């Protein structure tokens, strides 16, 4: 990881053949939406005529009780979804990925990356059908992790997983799958709580996708078009792309979203790459016939089955009408502000103003203690810092560094 001095981030320029009744059709459309929203990682919800094709297949998608029945919920009809991209080189049972897969991922051995949540995006979908907002949380933000003190926000998952497994082993548990499954549940609980405490807003649902899942998603979509402002080449991630628009396969797409070396703002530029990829994937699902191809839909289902975990009981039927505009471009991504860079326990971290971050999220979602507050000089001054983290809009193929 690059070495950062304590400097301002501004200076680190980074989609039935048979007839259906309306009620039954809605149920099936909702189930299709449930699959697609996870696979695109920004909830691609749409009621396609091919919904019947996957109807009986969706129960195989992993589910989790980590959110908790008593967790705070949004009270205004809107929905907040935490999207977690897990940087592990292992499958859901803790087994190492095959060597040929690791080679394609250009991600090194299964010992690298641990269980870091290297991608964290809070997606806010308003109740009125307005523009959805995606808030990217830089993975190295120094925050309070319950039970573990201050550390990088991405580490909450792995720290809690390791602690849970140690406790289980002390109780005599030796079954590897049980250790993996219960450890991951503890990790999800900790990551959700850490993000919720940091942002000060409810988390209604979550979706987790693995590193290999991201790779397989891009392949299942038959490539995703992206756009770069400048040519890049990086031996660490495997990124080697010319400037301009280009279509990337799964291996290339993973390199595109993982590169940070050689980018002027390092991790912050990588975050914008992730946002641009998601915006492009949404646009592609809506525009190139993904939802009319049974073969492609089956491929997407298989990606979800092996690589995606959702919170249990996610009833999407009530959510379809809210989110139906996402694939039409009514979504915008922004990166939450970073004050400076420093060292913590020998590692590079982002220093953040939690009050500013909370205010930014709460005001833009209309939730929390700061919702509805306007007009202060302090708030107007805060808005200027948005210039250092330009927004990424949906509805096309955005160009990024």
Residue ranges and their predicted role:
Residues 2-401:
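Non-catalytic, solvent-exposed segments at the cell envelope interface
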